[in-house]
Amino acid sequence: MEDFHHISVLPDEVLQALSPRSGGVYVDGTLGGAGHAGLILTASAPDGQLIGFDRDEEAIAVARERLQVFGGRVRIIHRNFAGIAQALAEIGVDGIDGFVLDLGVSSHQLDRDERGFSFMHDAPLDMRMDRSSGQSAADLVNTLPEGELYRIISEYGEERWAKRVASFIVKARDERPIETTLQLVDVIKGSIPKAKWEERLHPATRTFQALRIAVNEELKSLEEGLEGLLSLLKQGGRGAVISFHSLEDRIVKEGFRAAATGCTCPKELPICICGRVPRFKLVTRKPITAGEAEVAANPRSRSAKLRVVEKI
């Protein structure tokens, strides 16, 4: 696994947001290359604890190797963070001092041809984060009704040409199954008028994003995982979430805002009757983004947005 590479985005900003301390219990719900996890463990020495989750078996193997220097201070679990609250309850953890979620697809996943995430190389059309379960992208494009394909590409990819893309996919699969990434790329290119291709965006970008989100149920996982993690934060504990596209950022923004909302009674009422009090405060009113130096060193950080919330 020496070739596993992934540069964690906004590392200093995450560390500053969480302010890890000795004796604290922290969760990294998206271990990846263990970059954020290693920083948290180092900052929380000598006895801070970290519990890491990832649904990708390759990431789990790499994290175990890279974090073994921290010994018993780290526990690694191969599991989607959607079920994080239950997983923590199973190991006797009922409260945490901080958590981080980095929602980006790792450089390793994108660059490994056989994973099927990239439209730049030919590979089996897979896109599963956890290859031991669930349907692949090929399963979806070859079996879903045209209307459902349209919904996925439009809703998850925010693709203006979704209707044509879905129609062309169905026509192509009627001739032969779409089994590889470049097969799908050719179909997408044929469906979008070349004069309408965006200058700095590959024509397959939005459709590939949509299929990846659908295959891995990413938005559903985010909603469930975020709710579970917020419920476990101790007073003064902080949650930091890095998103990479508007759909994710909207869920995080609305989830944090709802948690930080107090009375919802109509303004004309003289007193509060709803009894709702804010449980959290927003540490970041606007998301933190990468600076010029980080973007130059790691172009994938360009679209990253970090939001932070604190339990009160």
UniProtKB/Swiss-Prot annotation:
Protein origin, superkingdom: Bacteria
EC number(s) per entry: 2.1.1.199
GO cellular component: cytoplasm
Reaction(s) catalysed by this chain's protein: cytidine(1402) in 16S rRNA + S-adenosyl-L-methionine = N(4)-methylcytidine(1402) in 16S rRNA + S-adenosyl-L-homocysteine + H(+)
Keywords assigned by UniProt, alphabetized: Cytoplasm, Methyltransferase, rRNA processing, S-adenosyl-L-methionine, Transferase
Family to which this protein belongs: Belongs to the methyltransferase superfamily. RsmH family.
Protein name: Ribosomal RNA small subunit methyltransferase H
Organism whose genome encodes this protein: Citrifermentans bemidjiense (strain ATCC BAA-1014 / DSM 16622 / JCM 12645 / Bem)
